[in-house]
Amino acid sequence: MNGIIPFVILVLFSSNGLSSAGDSNSAVDIGKPGDAEKVSRTVKLTQMDNMFLPGEVKVVEGETIRFVIKNGGNHKHEMLLGPMTELKKAAEMRRKYPDKEHSEAHLVQLEPGEQKELIWQFTRAGTIDFACPLPGHFKKMHGTIIVEKK
């Protein structure tokens, strides 16, 4: 009996940890759509046909950033924020279903020459990735956002 209670507690904590680790609602982990009136600065990103420029951005926890994204390439591109595991899943889905339309708060779709904005608040310190998940683009078109502690 004495060994059962610690085992049950261990199982309960392990189950809780697994369920949150596998949570598909990654928007909570990467922040949330930001308020345009609370933007602290603007970061310009350019999408070329094989990379993002710059490939790394540093922000501070709690900061609201206005990303101005320009497609400087010759093909349609996307910019999707998320953990790399989720970006890989998105790239696989785009490969399997290339004609399916997507619309997430942490996604921007751009035609060649087009420019759009994404306003995002970074609520937790850590690393967040961004990528173009379109077929043939993902392997080279990705970057990192480093969210530093306040």
For each of these PLM feature ranges, what is it?
Residues 22-38:
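A eukaryote-biased signal for short, well-structured alpha-helical docking elements
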Residues 78-82:
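Beta-strand signatures of extracellular beta-sandwich domains
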Residues 35-64:
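N-terminal edge beta-strand
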Residues 22-25, 51, 104-150:
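Extracellular/periplasmic metallocenter environments
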Residues 6-15:
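Bacterial N-terminal signal peptides
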Residues 85-96:
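Short aromatic-acidic-glycine turn motif
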